């Protein structure tokens, strides 16, 4: 919510303190457009449409274009599921006004909803210095899709598989 302040702080302090990750990689990773870069570099991502701020498009048009049954809309710069909504081809009209308000203020993602989030949760692999250190599994509370603890989600230690670790290492290799 205080993105501009954070960017200013980073610019002012990047030569005064040492960040664990470089200023450039932090700045790149703040905006979820980094997913587009990873995809261009051969990393599989959730099917996503990237929508620039001010784009004139409706949710109906997006569902028609993608033929998805369910989707998630969210700002490209967001944390803790701020302005993140799970919508379907049957209820999208309920979200049209909020979508139009947000798209007029900031860039957004329209992503295919991955149902396994509800049953399996979301896995986060932590990489430090390009090396895997540990992983967590985030699960949504019953009746919600958001895995963040701000919304009742639960975080627990997770033992990543070798293929998951390899995927994370491949992602790190594809970062700028």
Question: Language-model features: where?
Answer:
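Short amphipathic alpha-helical segments and helix-helix/interface helices
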Residues: 6-11, 35, 60-63, 96-100, ...
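Structured helix-beta-strand junction loops
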Residues: 15-16, 41, 69, 104-106
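Short acidic/polar capping segments at secondary-structure boundaries
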Residues: 24-26, 52-56, 76-80, 90-92, ...
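Phosphate-binding site of ATP-dependent enzymes
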Residues: 82-176
């Amino acid at each position: 919510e205080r993105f501009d302040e954070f960017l200013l702080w980073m610019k002012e302090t990047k030569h005064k303190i040492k960040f664990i990750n470089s200023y450039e990689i932090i700045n790149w990773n703040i905006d979820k457009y980094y997913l587009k870069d990873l995809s261009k570099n051969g990393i599989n991502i959730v099917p996503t449409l990237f929508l620039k701020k001010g784009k004139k498009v409706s949710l109906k048009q997006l569902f028609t274009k993608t033929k998805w049954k369910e989707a998630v809309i969210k700002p490209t710069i967001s944390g803790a599921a701020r302005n993140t909504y799970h919508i379907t081809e049957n209820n999208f009209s309920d979200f049209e006004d909020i979508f139009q308000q947000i798209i007029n203020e900031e860039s957004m993602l329209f992503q295919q909803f991955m149902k396994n989030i509800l049953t399996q949760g979301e896995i986060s692999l932590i990489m430090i210095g390009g090396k895997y250190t540990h992983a967590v599994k985030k699960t949504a509370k019953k009746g919600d899709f958001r895995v963040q603890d701000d919304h009742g989600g639960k975080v627990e230690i997770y033992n990543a598989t070798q293929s998951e670790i390899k995927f994370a290492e491949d992602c790190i290799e594809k970062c700028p």
